[in-house]
């Protein structure tokens, strides 16, 4: 469920005043994740790496309350749930968008992920949960390694967005550079940093 709230009644009141009409209110953080454990678990359990990373992203986000509030247009919207978006190549060879509702239960999330990414790939129709859930956008550039990405401010979508390329092997460990973009009205750097730390911790905890 989504509902409009008064910014003055929230901890984001001053940020709303400062950043809602800024020319570029988006901030990008870069972080290199150690994904060694995630790769080992995905291979051992025959699970998709990107599905598991999306699950960890959702799990890391629910621990930061700022993820449940998002500036939409000139309004501040409160959400009860979080979903993770993934980009799917459809049968026409083009890309479609698929939102997956976050569930704390990995098996439930996996089933939803497999069901709806296959459905979107076959139909080419986007699956949009933004009316009810705060969406975390993701994009995996699987054909190449990238160091990061900036300048993803559309002026329309204010959702947090994470992008990554191919992971890299160094010795016996695997690393994945990511870019995390967020709207400064939604959260401050400390909140973004906490999310990224949560993300690394969730990756390490996967079994």
Predicted regions and their residues:
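Helical lid/core segments from catalytic subdomains that handle acyl or acyl-like groups
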Residues: 90-144
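Active-site cores that bind ATP or allylic diphosphates and position pyrophosphate for catalysis
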Residues: 147
């Amino acid at each position: 469920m989504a509902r409009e709230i008064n910014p003055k009644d929230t901890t984001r009141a001053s940020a709303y005043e400062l950043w809602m009409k800024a020319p570029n209110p988006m901030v990008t953080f870069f972080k290199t994740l150690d994904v060694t454990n995630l790769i080992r678990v995905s291979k051992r359990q025959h699970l998709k790496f990107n599905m598991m990373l999306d699950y960890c992203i959702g799990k890391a986000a629910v621990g930061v309350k700022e993820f449940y509030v998002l500036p939409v247009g000139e309004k501040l919207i409160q959400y009860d749930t979080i979903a993770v978006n993934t980009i799917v190549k459809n049968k026409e060879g083009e890309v479609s968008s698929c939102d997956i509702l976050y569930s704390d239960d990995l098996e439930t999330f996996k089933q939803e992920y497999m069901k709806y990414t296959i459905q979107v790939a076959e139909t080419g129709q986007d699956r949009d949960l933004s009316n009810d859930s705060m969406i975390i956008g993701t994009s995996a550039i699987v054909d190449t390694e990238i160091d990061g990405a900036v300048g993803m401010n559309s002026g329309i979508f204010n959702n947090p967005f994470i992008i990554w390329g191919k992971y890299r092997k160094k010795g016996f460990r695997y690393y994945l550079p990511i870019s995390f973009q967020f709207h400064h009205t939604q959260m401050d750097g400390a909140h973004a940093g906490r999310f990224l730390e949560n993300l690394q911790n969730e990756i390490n905890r996967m079994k």
